[in-house]
């Protein structure tokens, strides 16, 4: 950065940086004292933003009068015009034209400015007290400053307490959503990811992005991901539509079903359509059910999705906070219209009704009566059982797809639909929903231009996970594996260090990706090696090669929210849990300081802390050591000490109505094992043979007790439950 001489005519002082755009040109100043070197003054580029006292948004005034006027016009409109049209797109154009005209007439889109007001509990006297404190700080009067600082803290807590009991406490029974929002505001726990500063450090190709250009840059990148994918062959889709016959009766949607679907839309969620908001659809469900029902039935009958349902507003959701790279730190979530969600819900029901007969038994994602916990139990049971033999070498491959949903090839997906013999109406509708989708990115109320996508299935829609589940359904291996939508885990068990079964599985994965036009993220794909023999050289096990890249071998890996380690202990996972909940003590402490009702704080503790400590506990509870179990119990003990400072732990449990965490985990394990014993459960096949003793006694086992050589296997979920006679 230094370009001027710093000693005589020579440049002897250097400053190196890879972020030169953030610094001004160094200023060369005279030397200090007797030094022969000039002083190099380097300053960062500081852009002073003029604080904006308001923000501008565009919204419609959907009050009672405007909604009533809209309803009256819709009731009197002759919808027979729409019913007599035989083209789905023409029906949609007429429907949206009528709705737009009526809504614009009674609730026009207006520009509204919102002032950045103070917090609702702040008063003028409190603001004056803050000014006096700041003046004392600037004057250097330490004693006066500390006195005013303490006074500010006391007054602030008092104002918050009064505000809670006068304005917030009553919302608990009236509007729990607003109650929870005010609770987070009072405790200072609002999500920082929702602020306007979330994307200030984003870079694309190493270049910082101007905030005004951010939506357009994001949209260009999201669309560029699909640049190398071939678009859908329209000839095949037209041939499929030409073979459409009469739609089956079970595909016909009733007006009452549409009415119920509209009534169950979430009014608190946004919609891509600024005319038909979810609030308007819910309020006018009885009026709009008939025309929307006709539109959905025509769409299914013709296998065509109207263009209005294929437009999405993309909201970039950070994977990390704050996000730094556009290429890897953002996830595009598509927000579609409310009517599109209703239509998707009916088609997804038809999809699942057919596909449930073909879905892979090792697929646990987005499938009825299956969850992440079931996938984790299947994998952990296999690992603990295999590790009981000291000669077994266990290798686990954790697969990560690169841009999994964005790279779905529509031509490949169409072939999968046909291969699984889906009804042609479902195929045509699903492919039409993906064909020539249009999206725009919205950031801070700034929208990019609309662009058309050639591939991918939108995240955030109801049909997106189903499409990917169909795509990956034929990905199978000759060894054990489990899938949760795009998270795939492969397990190899062998006694020979030279065994190549996992490498064969990796080669099979590469071939599948080549055939289905998918990509593996080899940087995030990991391998774990588990072995408990006395003499073992890890170097004897050849490294795994995937797409000509060597896969990194790790000691720990977080799979579906649970950390597995190479020694099959739960220490790393317990440390992860304790670290995660430690960040949330502050919320409990702040609410207790404000004098919030103890029962309310207990509810908040159960929601934000206890739920974390109990996630997938059926997998790891039985393998905890006494120390680990006590460490987890200490979290609840600490929270109850904050909420009930004058009570012992036992008395606090009694007053709050809570159980010990170890007792709750034990009950969860017992209930999970009872569910698995149902014959139609997805994990019923992991149970050992059922015993038929000649004499039934209190101490007999329902299942054959696994013979465990190690305490590790004896404390696994399955062996533990059988030994406990659950």
PLM features: residue spans?
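Active-site palm subdomain of RNA-directed nucleic acid polymerases
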Residues: 347-364, 387-388, 394, 465-492
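Short, conserved micro-motifs composed of acidic
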Residues: 5-28, 248, 444-445, 504, ...
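Short, charged alpha-helical motifs in flexible N/C-terminal segments and linkers
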Residues: 115-217, 251-296, 301-305, 314, ...
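Metal-dependent phosphoesterases centered on the DNase I-like endonuclease/exonuclease/phosphatase
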Residues: 1-20, 73-86, 178, 422, ...
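Surface-exposed loop/turn segments and immediately adjacent short secondary-structure elements
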Residues: 43, 49, 82, 86-93, ...
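Conserved catalytic palm subdomain of right-hand nucleotidyl-transferase polymerases, strongest
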Residues: 267-276, 314, 325-335, 373-418
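Conserved polymerase palm-domain catalytic core
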Residues: 399-484, 493
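Surface polyanion/phosphate-binding segment centered on an Asp-His-Pro turn
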Residues: 19-115, 193-198, 204-216, 220, ...
């Amino acid at each position: 950065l230094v370009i001027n001489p710093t000693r005589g005519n020579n440049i002897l002082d250097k400053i190196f940086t890879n972020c030169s755009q953030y610094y001004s040109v160094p200023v060369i100043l005279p030397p200090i004292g007797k030094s022969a070197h000039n002083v190099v003054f380097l300053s960062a580029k500081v852009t002073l933003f003029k604080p904006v006292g308001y923000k501008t948004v565009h919204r419609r005034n959907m009050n009672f009068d405007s909604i009533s006027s809209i309803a009256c016009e819709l009731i009197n409109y002759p919808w027979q015009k729409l019913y007599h049209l035989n083209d789905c797109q023409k029906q949609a154009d007429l429907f949206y034209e009528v709705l737009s005209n009526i809504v614009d007439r009674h609730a026009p889109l207006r520009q509204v400015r919102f002032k950045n007001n103070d917090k609702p509990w702040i008063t003028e006297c409190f603001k004056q007290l803050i000014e006096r404190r700041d003046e004392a700080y600037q004057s250097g009067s330490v004693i006066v400053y500390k006195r005013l600082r303490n006074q500010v803290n006391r007054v602030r807590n008092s104002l918050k307490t009064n505000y809670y009991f006068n304005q917030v406490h009553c919302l608990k029974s009236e509007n729990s959503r607003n109650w929870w929002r005010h609770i987070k505001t009072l405790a200072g726990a609002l999500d920082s990811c929702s602020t306007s500063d979330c994307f200030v450090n984003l870079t694309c190709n190493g270049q910082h992005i101007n905030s005004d250009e951010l939506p357009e840059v994001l949209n260009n990148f999201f669309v560029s991901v699909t640049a190398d994918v071939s678009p859908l062959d329209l000839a095949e889709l037209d041939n499929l539509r030409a073979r459409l016959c009469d739609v089956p009766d079970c595909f016909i949607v009733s007006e009452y079903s549409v009415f119920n679907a509209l009534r169950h839309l979430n009014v608190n969620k946004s919609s891509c359509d600024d005319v038909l908001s979810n609030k308007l659809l819910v309020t006018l469900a009885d009026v709009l059910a008939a025309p929307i029902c006709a539109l959905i039935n025509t769409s299914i009958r013709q296998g065509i999705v109207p263009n209005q349902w294929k437009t999405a507003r993309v909201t970039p959701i950070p994977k990390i906070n704050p996000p730094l790279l556009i290429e890897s730190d953002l996830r595009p979530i598509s927000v579609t219209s409310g009517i599109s969600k209703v239509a998707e819900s009916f088609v997804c029901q038809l999809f699942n009704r057919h596909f449930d007969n073909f879905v892979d038994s090792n697929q646990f994602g987005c499938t009825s009566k299956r969850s992440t916990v079931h996938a984790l139990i299947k994998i952990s049971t296999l690992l603990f059982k295999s590790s009981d033999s000291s000669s077994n070498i266990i290798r686990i491959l954790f697969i990560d797809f690169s841009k999994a949903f964005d790279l779905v090839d529509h031509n490949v997906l169409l072939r999968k639909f046909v291969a699984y013999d889906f009804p042609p109406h479902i195929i045509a509708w699903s492919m039409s929903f993906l064909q020539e989708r249009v999206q725009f990115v919205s950031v801070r109320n700034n929208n990019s231009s609309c662009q058309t996508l050639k591939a991918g299935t939108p995240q955030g829609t109801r049909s997106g996970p189903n499409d990917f589940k169909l795509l990956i359904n034929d990905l199978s291996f000759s060894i054990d594996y489990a899938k949760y939508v795009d998270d795939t885990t492969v397990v190899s068990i062998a006694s020979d260090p030279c065994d190549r079964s996992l490498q064969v599985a990796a080669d099979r994965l590469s071939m599948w990706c080549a055939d289905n036009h998918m990509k593996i993220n080899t940087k995030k794909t990991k391998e774990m090696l588990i072995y408990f023999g006395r003499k073992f050289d890890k170097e004897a096990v050849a490294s795994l090669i995937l797409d000509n890249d060597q896969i990194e071998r790790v000691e720990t890996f977080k799979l579906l929210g649970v950390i597995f380690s190479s020694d099959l202990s739960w220490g790393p996972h317990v440390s992860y849990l304790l670290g995660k909940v430690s960040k949330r003590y502050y919320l409990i402490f702040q609410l207790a300081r404000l004098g919030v009702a103890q029962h309310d704080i207990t509810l908040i503790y159960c929601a934000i802390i206890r739920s974390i400590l109990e996630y997938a506990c059926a997998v790891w509870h039985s393998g905890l050591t006494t120390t680990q179990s006590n460490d987890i119990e200490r979290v609840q003990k600490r929270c109850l000490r904050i909420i009930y400072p004058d009570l012992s732990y036992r008395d606090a449990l009694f007053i709050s109505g809570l159980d010990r965490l170890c007792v709750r985990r034990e009950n969860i394990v017992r209930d999970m094992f009872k569910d698995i014993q149902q014959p139609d459960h997805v994990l019923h096949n992991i149970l050992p043979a059922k015993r038929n003793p000649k004499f039934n006694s209190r101490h007999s086992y329902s299942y054959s007790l696994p013979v465990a050589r190690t305490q590790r296997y004896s404390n696994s979920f399955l062996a533990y439950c059988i030994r406990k006679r659950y």
